[in-house]
């Protein structure tokens, strides 16, 4: 389905996501061989399967996790060493927070139960670096092109939205792990950092991967999780911005300055109320340089695949054209006006309506774009609108317009 519907439009990857606690199939070094025990085939099979169809495989996993199956088996050794994997984690640690079952060990999560709760690597133990870097290289050998590393905030300080849920490993150890991963990845696999605190404007994360999340999970989808929830609020921990809209505005220039891609999480167009909301979601992610991560399924997408297939908009991604908001203050109305520029000099002007009421928009080209007049093309209507000195429209609730302006001297 993906190969037929989306590969012709430039989509290049299928990535796994989410819960891996039901996967206990490991190799002799403790590395997972598949996403779930019910899977018949391993990572390499699916990577090769996708490659034959013009796609790459992305995998959701954190190399600092250790499967309980590896801890139980003393013969599972860190690759290239005689060190049992069970010796590179703290088995005696007892978390005194929410841990009703009194599970022992430095665990990723405590409510899951003894047999399913993953362990964290102890970076100060012999073999830890070899294990983490070996995991990254293992995925490379499986022809995996993209590694989606989740729950980084939980490792750094054990905090989730201001609440303690696990052990605080410290920012120094967190940074050390990211450096190990970066070194092992080289230019052979793309690293995506998920659920980072991004403390001090991302001082630990920038340079450690190609991409990082800037908002909470898309969850149940819809406009609320894309734009409305906690609108105008900013936090000093994960996630500093709740929604994709807030995150893309706030982090736009900071990420660009560090040559890193903003990840706004998945899109499920089937959860939006109408096509206007869908077009706004796709437009914003494209102009901001975020990946279009389709999480609709073949049996849920209904008649909205065409919104992912707008070739005039997708061309902006192929040309690596970034747009930026006039203001990175999410409370400022100018944050809904974005401007980008092609190498040929053409201007991409995008305007959004985040509100539930119709909104009048008027933009004077001379004042905002520093040009007197321009030929205007609407990239959703696929129509030339003629020469204009300003643009005036009534935006529908949650709607947008994306225009290409060719300046006239």
Predicted feature descriptions by range:
Residues 1-133, 137, 144-146, 151-165:
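Aromatic-lined carbohydrate-binding/catalytic grooves of carbohydrate-active enzymes
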Residues 387-409:
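C-terminal beta-strand-rich structural cap/linker in extracellular carbohydrate-active enzymes
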Residues 130-183, 193-196, 253, 259-284:
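Active-site and adjacent substrate-binding regions of carbohydrate-active enzymes
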Residues 366-382:
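Solvent-exposed beta-hairpin/edge-strand motifs
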Residues 12-17, 57-61, 146-150, 190-193, ...:
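Structural recognition of the beta-strand scaffold that forms the well-ordered cores
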Residues 102-103, 123-124, 184-299:
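Glycan-recognition surfaces
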Residues 279-281, 285-288, 293-295, 330-370, ...:
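Carbohydrate-binding surface patches
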Residues 56-70, 174, 178-202:
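Aromatic-lined carbohydrate-recognition surfaces of secreted/lumenal glycan-active proteins
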């Amino acid at each position: 389905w993906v190969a037929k519907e989306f590969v012709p439009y430039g989509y290049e990857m299928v990535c796994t996501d989410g819960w891996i606690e039901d996967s206990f199939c490991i190799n002799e070094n403790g590395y997972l061989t598949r996403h779930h025990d019910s899977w018949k085939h391993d990572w390499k099979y699916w990577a090769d399967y996708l490659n034959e169809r013009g796609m790459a495989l992305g995998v959701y996993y954190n190399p600092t996790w250790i499967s309980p199956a590896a801890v139980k088996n003393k013969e599972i050794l860190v690759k290239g060493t005689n060190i049992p994997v069970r010796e590179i984690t703290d088995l005696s640690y007892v978390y005194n927070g929410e841990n009703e079952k009194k599970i022992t060990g430095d665990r990723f999560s405590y409510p899951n139960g003894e047999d399913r709760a993953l362990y964290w690597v102890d970076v100060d133990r012999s073999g830890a670096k070899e294990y983490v870097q070996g995991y990254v290289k293992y995925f490379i050998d499986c022809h995996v092109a993209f590694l989606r590393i989740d729950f980084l905030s939980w490792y750094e300080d054990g905090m989730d939205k201001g609440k303690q849920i696990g052990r605080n490993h410290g920012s120094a150890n967190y940074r050390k792990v990211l450096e190990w991963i970066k070194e092992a990845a080289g230019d052979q696999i793309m690293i995506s950092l998920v659920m980072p605190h991004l403390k001090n404007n991302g001082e630990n994360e920038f340079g450690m991967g190609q991409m990082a999340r800037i908002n909470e999970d898309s969850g149940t989808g819809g406009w609320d999780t894309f734009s409305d929830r906690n609108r105008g609020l900013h936090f000093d921990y994960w996630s500093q911005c709740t929604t994709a809209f807030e995150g893309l505005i706030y982090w736009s220039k900071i990420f660009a300055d560090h040559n890193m891609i903003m990840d706004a999480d998945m899109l499920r167009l089937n959860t939006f109320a109408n096509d206007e909301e869908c077009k706004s979601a796709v437009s914003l992610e494209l102009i901001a340089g975020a990946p279009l991560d389709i999480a609709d399924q073949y049996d849920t997408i209904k008649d909205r695949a065409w919104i992912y297939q707008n070739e005039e908009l997708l061309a902006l991604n192929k040309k690596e054209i970034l747009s930026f908001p006039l203001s990175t203050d999410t409370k400022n109305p100018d944050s809904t006006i974005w401007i980008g520029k092609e190498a040929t000099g053409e201007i991409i002007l995008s305007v959004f309506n985040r509100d539930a009421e119709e909104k009048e928009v008027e933009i004077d080209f001379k004042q905002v774009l520093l040009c007197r007049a321009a030929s205007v093309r609407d990239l959703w209507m696929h129509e030339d609108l003629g020469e204009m000195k300003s643009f005036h429209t009534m935006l529908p609730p949650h709607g947008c317009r994306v225009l290409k302006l060719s300046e006239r001297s």
